[in-house]
Design a protein with these regions (language model features):
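A structural signal for short, well-ordered beta-strand segments
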Residues: 93-95, 128-130, 217-221
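Short, surface-exposed loop/helix-turn segments at secondary-structure junctions
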Residues: 107-113, 168-183, 213, 232-237
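Non-heme Fe(II)-dependent double-stranded beta-helix
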Residues: 1-120, 232, 236-242
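Non-heme Fe(II)/2-oxoglutarate
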Residues: 2-8, 12, 44, 52, ...
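Double-stranded beta-helix
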Residues: 138-202, 226, 240
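Extracellular structured ligand-interaction cores
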Residues: 123-127, 139, 184-186, 214-216
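Short, solvent-exposed loop/turn segments at secondary-structure junctions
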Residues: 35-36, 65, 96-98, 135, ...
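Active-site region of the double-stranded beta-helix
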Residues: 86, 115, 130-141, 149
């Protein structure tokens, strides 16, 4: 029997406006790319493996094939490969729950760049974030600094960012050039929306002070054969997508 999270979905063709917006700003939100039932299934699978306080879970897809399918879905891969103009590979996955009324709910991530972790010298990594429930400021959505991806990897202070202390603010802390400070943009997402972030786009997130959880399923991609740091916790490695 075919699983709910499968590869039987059409490719997605970006419009010229969408393509240009991403390359100018370093991010884009694709509306309603995932169905409510797909989002519910992703969240359900992660909840089955969650610990009491719902800390982040890394690379569960390597044990749960149905989650690994999400990395390889044509409607996702087609977008990634169009944006990097090349064949891509998957690198890692992560669920950030921000589960309401838990010790990790109110964590607000410092402004950081994902590529500070990946360490790809050419800026050829992208991370998708699938909103498994609605995400808004009060329940911990992300904010971005448009155009900051053009700066390359900025200097940063390395900080613990996985299984960190409860109530702490994780994320490598960077010094953002002043010209971006007035352009902070909150990303309000509906269930099923997918955010795509350039690896060098500076971003952070708010804490969750509500009764509404904010689970985001994140998957990182890289230009096939690109250089990256494996990482002690992330254990990144290339996965074929075709």
């Amino acid at each position: 029997m075919e699983t709910l999270l499968n590869l039987n979905n059409p490719t997605y063709k970006l419009s010229t406006v969408e393509y240009n917006f991403f390359h100018e700003n370093g991010y884009i939100v694709i509306k309603a790319l995932f169905s409510e039932t797909e989002c519910d299934r992703i969240y359900e699978l992660f909840c089955e493996h969650a610990e009491e306080d719902f800390p982040a879970i890394i690379n569960l897809d390597r044990k749960v094939p149905e989650l690994h399918n999400v990395m390889k879905m044509p409607k996702v891969v087609s977008i990634i490969e169009e944006l990097i103009d090349s064949e891509a590979s998957g690198l890692m996955t992560q669920m950030l729950f921000k589960e309401a009324n838990t010790a990790y709910a109110n964590q607000a991530w410092e402004v950081h760049q994902d590529n500070a972790y990946h360490q790809n010298p050419n800026g050829e990594t992208l991370t998708i974030n699938i909103a498994c429930k609605d995400a808004f400021v009060e329940n911990g959505t992300l904010y971005v600094y448009p155009g900051s991806h053009k700066e390359g990897i900025l200097k940063f202070e390395a900080r613990k960012s996985f299984r960190e202390d409860k109530g702490s603010q994780p994320g490598n802390k960077l010094l953002l050039p002043e010209k971006y400070l007035d352009h902070k943009t909150d990303l309000i997402m509906k269930k099923g929306d997918m955010l795509i972030l350039h690896g060098n786009c500076a971003h952070g997130s708010y804490g969750n002070s509500t009764e509404f959880s904010r689970p985001l399923y994140s998957i990182t991609y890289i230009k096939k054969g690109g250089e990256f740091l494996v990482g002690r916790n992330a254990n990144r490695k290339e996965f074929a997508l075709h």
